[in-house]
């Protein structure tokens, strides 16, 4: 069954976690529960994109520290912070650190689901763009030093002969390297290779 998105709930209060799990699951979201922020951060590298709903006051790593660490990692996950009644200063600090919004407990179910849908809608394009950029960077990293040199020559507009002369190797060998570059970069044409190089930051200067 297709869900409306995945939600990562972080709260040390078991009753609150269970309540949110029921609410969000009923609303059509996929849900993963964490009882503390450190457990979420430990799992983060392997998690698919989703929205984080976290309590602000928790033992150990609190919601503010979680935001600081997520910001330092440049995580694309949108974060909604839940605060207690009257915790406005903490909520403001959370917003300054990158939280997309905050909710004062107790809150209306519809308000939370609307906020989550909005947060996912706004953050998804950036998350997808970041994933694509990481994929392209991984392709570049898979190139051997010589393949990287050949790619740099190609995107600079040099012919096979000129690249061969530059590195004192035969044009035939350059053709082999060129084919390897196109395969590893998953490029079907030189123009596509140039676009990928731009995304990888190889044409910024």
Swiss-Prot record:
Cofactor: Mg(2+)
PTM notes: Phosphorylated by FixL.
MF terms (GO), sorted A to Z: DNA binding; metal ion binding
Keyword Nucleotide-binding: no
Annotated positions binding Mg(2+): 11-12, 55, 57
Localization (cell): Cytoplasm
SUPFAM superfamilies: C-terminal effector domain of the bipartite response regulators, CheY-like
Leader peptide range in chain numbering: none
Keywords assigned by UniProt, alphabetized: Activator, Cytoplasm, DNA-binding, Magnesium, Metal-binding, Nitrogen fixation, Phosphoprotein, Transcription, Transcription regulation, Two-component regulatory system
Cofactor note text: Binds 1 Mg(2+) ion per subunit.
GO process annotations (BP): nitrogen fixation; phosphorelay signal transduction system; regulation of DNA-templated transcription
Job of this protein: FixJ, when activated by FixL, induces the expression of both nifA, required for activation of classical nif and fix genes, and fixK, required for FixN activation.
NCBIfam families (alphabetical): PRK09390.1
Protein name stated in the entry: Transcriptional regulatory protein FixJ
Naturally occurring in which organism (per UniProt): Bradyrhizobium diazoefficiens (strain JCM 10833 / BCRC 13528 / IAM 13628 / NBRC 14792 / USDA 110)
Lineage: Bacteria, Pseudomonadati, Pseudomonadota, Alphaproteobacteria, Hyphomicrobiales
């Amino acid at each position: 069954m297709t869900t409306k998105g995945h939600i990562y709930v972080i709260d040390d209060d078991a009753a609150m976690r269970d309540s949110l799990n029921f609410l969000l699951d009923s609303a059509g979201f996929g849900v993963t529960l964490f009882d503390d922020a450190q457990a979420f951060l430990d799992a983060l590298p392997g998690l698919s994109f989703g929205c984080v709903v976290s309590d602000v006051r928790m033992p150990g790593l609190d919601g503010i520290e979680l935001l600081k660490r997520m910001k330092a990692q440049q995580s694309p996950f949108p974060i909604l912070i839940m605060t207690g009644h009257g915790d406005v200063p903490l909520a403001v600090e959370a917003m300054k650190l990158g939280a997309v919004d905050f909710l004062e407990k107790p809150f209306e179910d519809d308000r939370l689901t609307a906020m989550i849908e909005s947060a996912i809608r706004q953050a998804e394009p950036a998350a997808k763009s970041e994933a694509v950029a990481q994929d392209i960077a991984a392709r570049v990293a898979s190139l051997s030093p010589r393949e990287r040199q050949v790619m740099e020559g190609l995107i600079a507009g040099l012919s096979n002969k000129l690249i061969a002369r530059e590195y004192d190797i035969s044009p035939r060998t350059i053709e082999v390297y060129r084919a390897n570059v196109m395969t590893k970069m998953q490029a079907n044409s030189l123009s596509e290779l140039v676009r990928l190089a731009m995304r990888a930051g190889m044409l910024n200067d």
